[in-house]
């Protein structure tokens, strides 16, 4: 019989957010099975034009071969030491992901944690890598900021689920920029699109917003691929405590926003803590800069919290997590809430046992909370065990990551016809004035570039 924790966790790790069952599913259109899934179509570009790509679609980020660069860093980050200069073969990291549901529900924290999560993905590439600069894209329905904008009057104002488009554009851009400012990563470019349309009794609009966080970074070619875990590797968590934050984010974000009660949806939104993430990053950076990197593998804590992050670390061999070693900031948390909360700004690492003390010293110097919470076992099971020996979660790895039921999307082609716009040459100046008022036209810096470029000056844009 499954426990409450196992049922709850299974809903998260098998959500569309985590497993891409629709994205990787089979489409049957007009009775004809399509040759490729959406995911396969995207991967095809890399398959046919690999160029200098080293890793894609199998890690937190994609890596492409970079130039040889000169690294200036301390020889030993666990103590005061001399800086040394050495050449490293670099790789360039690229990443982009959406954070639509959280930004729709609570735009400031939704966009802030979208940027923060994307940064952590670049931190978690291979055995660790370094973020440099970020991007952000926002898409909403018309914001209706001023009167006298006729294109915004075609559709009536709806009963918005949580925030108006105007509030979302302001708060989301503030949130993404706030995280960049506090973490120390410039947002160097981005875009914004607002759109609504009605024709043939069909209505279009970004009522559920799109917030796309992206970025670029770099790492060493030595560390661009994850290592294989072996029995006895230590499971380490670096970052903040567990709280009742972000519960069910993976599953809730995989369905239509508004399907669940506002209490459930608001509880599924994470909260941002850029300072804690910077501390965790400083540890990752330090380990990557040293002559020998003790990290076997690394993942970030995002959707489904500990259970998703740590299970991915030990997927090849299994692992046991001691719940008494997990930091709990709220003593009222249940077992499932400890296991699967999405308190942000945490990284999970597999560390060679003999290097634990060295990593601990680095973490202490960076004021980054570090916890050795378990180890790999080799029994191909993944379990969380309480101090009294009870295991609220204990499943075979195969049960967690085995092949999900194949998803089939059956549909038919719908022919749509749209009228060509009608223009009057005498109104050319009026048309031009209106077009230039659209948020999607011209420079977007007023919305996207609120992060101080001095943090990593000179920035990549410079």
Regions found by a protein language model. Give the residues of each.
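Glycine/proline-enriched, intrinsically flexible loops and inter-domain linkers
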Residues: 1-457, 461
């Amino acid at each position: 019989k499954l426990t409450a924790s196992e049922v709850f966790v299974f809903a998260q790790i098998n959500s569309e957010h985590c497993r891409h069952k629709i994205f990787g599913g089979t489409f049957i259109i007009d009775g004809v099975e399509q040759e490729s899934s959406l995911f396969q179509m995207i991967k095809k570009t890399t398959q046919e034009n690999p160029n200098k790509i080293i890793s894609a679609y199998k890690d937190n980020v994609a890596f492409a071969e970079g130039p040889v660069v000169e690294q200036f860093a301390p020889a030993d980050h666990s103590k005061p030491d001399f800086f040394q200069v050495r050449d490293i073969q670099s790789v360039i990291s690229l990443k982009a992901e959406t954070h639509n549901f959280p930004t729709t529900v609570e735009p400031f924290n939704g966009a802030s944690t979208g940027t923060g999560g994307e940064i952590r993905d670049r931190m978690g590439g291979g055995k660790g890598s370094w973020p440099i600069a970020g991007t952000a894209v926002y898409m909403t329905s018309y914001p209706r900021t001023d009167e006298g904008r006729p294109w915004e009057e075609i559709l009536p104002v709806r009963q918005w689920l949580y925030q108006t488009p105007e509030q979302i554009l302001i708060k989301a851009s503030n949130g993404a920029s706030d995280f960049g400012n506090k973490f120390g990563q410039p947002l160097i470019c981005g875009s914004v699109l607002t759109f609504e349309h009605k024709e043939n009794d069909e209505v279009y609009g970004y009522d559920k917003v799109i917030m796309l966080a992206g970025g670029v970074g770099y790492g060493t070619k030595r560390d661009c691929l994850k290592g294989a875990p072996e029995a006895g590797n230590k499971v380490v968590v670096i970052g903040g405590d567990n709280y009742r934050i972000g519960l069910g984010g993976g599953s809730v974000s995989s369905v239509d926003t508004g399907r669940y009660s506002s209490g459930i949806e608001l509880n599924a939104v994470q909260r941002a803590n850029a300072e804690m993430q910077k501390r965790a990053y400083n540890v990752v950076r330090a380990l990557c800069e040293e002559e020998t990197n003790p990290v076997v593998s690394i993942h970030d804590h995002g959707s489904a919290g500990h259970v998703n992050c740590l299970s991915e670390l030990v997927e090849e061999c299994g692992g046991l997590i001691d719940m008494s070693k997990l930091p709990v900031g709220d003593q009222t948390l249940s077992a499932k809430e400890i296991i699967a909360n999405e308190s942000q700004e945490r990284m999970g690492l597999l560390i060679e046992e003999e290097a634990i003390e060295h990593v601990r010293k680095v973490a202490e110097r960076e004021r980054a909370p570090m916890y050795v919470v378990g180890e790999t076992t080799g029994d191909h099971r993944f379990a969380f065990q309480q101090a009294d020996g009870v295991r609220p979660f204990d499943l075979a790895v195969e049960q967690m990551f085995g092949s999900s039921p194949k998803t089939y999307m059956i549909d038919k082609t719908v022919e749509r016809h749209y009228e060509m716009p009608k223009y009057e040459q005498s109104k050319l100046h009026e048309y031009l004035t209106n077009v230039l008022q659209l948020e999607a036209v011209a420079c977007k810096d007023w919305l996207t570039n609120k992060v101080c470029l001095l943090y990593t000056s000179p920035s990549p844009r410079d």
